[in-house]
Amino acid sequence: MSIKITTLVENSVYGKGLQGEHGLSLLVDTGGHRLLFDTGASDLFIRNARMLGIDLKNVDFLVLSHGHRDHTGGLHHFLQVNQKAEVVCKKELFIPKFKEERENGVMHPDALDSTRFRFVDEVTELCPSVFVFPRLAIADEEDTHFEHFFTLAGGNKQADTFTDELALVLKQGDEVSVLSACSHRGITNIIRVVQEYFPQTPLKLVLGGFHIRNTAKEKFDVIARFFENHLPQRLGVCHCTGIDKYALFHQCFGDRAFYNYTGRVEIL
């Protein structure tokens, strides 16, 4: 069974007629089910989908990786064009979020149709071959990305440790692929959690943002050292990873590393 991943929104774009924005939205098509992983920052994912001939009315699940606006900003727009999909996320998604002094969480959560939401707190198989991993334990504190981010608790700001973050995992035979939108809790930590659940299962694809753009090279080095022993067949970086860090990944791992831009299609 093949799985098709189409990038509806990413920071960069190369195809005519498509647009990019600071955000991420991936469409996963298993042949039997369609899942949207995040919505980007606006309704752009809908407009790009239309340009690509994709009808989002047929999406079965919307999975939200975490509450930041560049991943949930299109949520209201999606609920207007799609009347059937479950919205899968963690309850913590709606905790008010800030980047420094700027609000950066889900917009107007009180206006959302709560009957469409499915909150998960354990590994959940949404449909054959597709799993949500909502508990992302941190084994290596060096690969965490919490700086400048805050939440509100009892009216007081506190550091955001991204307890709302989850990952999407695709299981095909004896291989797994990991999709992680921003990896605030660390892509190496996320992969460790997946490998504990599926022991001795090779990595086919790791795809997403690693949140090391505009960070010191030491943050990249932590991830690169991990991949020296856990390198997937395909390593797709994008969004908050940064073009400069992609270049370093390509230097280290050659053509197994690629940049995942708006409009790109990956077939598994």
Model-predicted segments: where are they?
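Cap/insert and terminal regions of metallo-dependent hydrolase folds
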Residues: 68-71, 161-178, 182-262
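Structural motif
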Residues: 3-6, 34-35, 85-86, 129-131, ...
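A short, polar/proline- and glycine-enriched secondary-structure boundary/capping micro-motif
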Residues: 46-51, 143-144, 188-192
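Metallo-beta-lactamase
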Residues: 92-166, 253, 258-268
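Active-site metal-binding loops of divalent metal-dependent hydrolases
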Residues: 10-12, 39-42, 67, 92-93, ...
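Active-site metal-binding motif and surrounding structural segment of the metallo-beta-lactamase
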Residues: 44-92, 198-205, 231
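Conserved beta-strand hairpin/beta-sheet module of binuclear metal-dependent hydrolase folds
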Residues: 3-52, 161, 165-180
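Short, small-residue-enriched loops and turns at beta-alpha junctions
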Residues: 13-16, 156, 212-216
